[in-house]
Amino acid sequence: MIRYKGFILFLLLMLIGCEQREELISNLSQRQANEIISVLERHNITARKVDGGKQGISVQVEKGTFASAVDLMRMYDLPNPERVDISQMFPTDSLVSSPRAEKARLYSAIEQRLEQSLVSIGGVISAKIHVSYDLEEKNISSKPMHISVIAIYDSPKESELLVSNIKRFLKNTFSDVKYENISVILTPKEEYVYTNVQPVKEIKSEFLTNEVIYLFLGMAVLVVILLVWAFKTGWFKRNKI
């Protein structure tokens, strides 16, 4: 009997010592999950991917670092949206819409593509672009185009150079926009303070995945059922255990 009690105690200790993880975000693509994990690990937060099949990929972190992980995702504006494909914006089998609607969709796609391109500039963490354009089908008196940019950056020493690079990039993108009609607002990245909240003092086992945990739980339930059956049938008395 002592052996069975010891085995059950061992299983309980293993379950208590399992590393507690919490789902940070789900329904991600492989690229989005990799970007999130890269940012988290650069700030000493351990994260892992879990493939959910058709539901996409989820990212899990330890419960003690969940709050810090959420703050980092907000600071870096993660997850980044999927790359915009013009062919997806205008599929060949879609109904023909008005020229006004087609123009609005086109400029919306252009704005998203430009936002993705600006992140490639060194120092830019995330960017939002708004392009003013005339939706009228007959541009008899077309208004001059204006472009506004809000960018979050992490290199304050090169802020002036960053503004110049962004303006030059947008000026070369649109041939009919004037340099003075491009406005750029830079916002410095928030200071990050790492917080690691440990709810309980626990023994961590990196090799214990969810599948292993479920296996141990199943084994524990099976042992309990066998013990109950043995007591009811008098098996221990017959075998003098």
From Swiss-Prot:
Q: Where is the signal peptide?
A: 1-17
Q: Which Gene3D superfamilies match?
A: 3.30.300.30, Hypothetical protein rpa1041 (3.30.70.1530)
Q: Where is the lipid attached (S-diacylglycerol cysteine)?
A: 18
Lipid linkage positions (N-palmitoyl cysteine): 18
A single Gene Ontology biological process assigned to it is: protein secretion
Gene Ontology, cellular component aspect:
cell outer membrane
Pfam families per record: YscJ_FliF
> Keywords in UniProt for this one?
Cell outer membrane, Lipoprotein, Membrane, Palmitate, Plasmid, Protein transport, Signal, Transport, Virulence
Location(s) in or outside the cell: Cell outer membrane
- Topology in the membrane? Lipid-anchor
Annotated PROSITE patterns: PROKAR_LIPOPROTEIN (PS51257)
The record's section on PANTHER family has: FLAGELLAR M-RING PROTEIN, SECRETION SYSTEM APPARATUS LIPOPROTEIN SSAJ
Known role: Involved in the secretion of the Ipa antigens.
| Family label | Belongs to the YscJ lipoprotein family.
Question: What is the name of the protein in this document?
Answer: Lipoprotein MxiJ
| Organism this protein belongs to | Shigella sonnei
Primary gene name: mxiJ
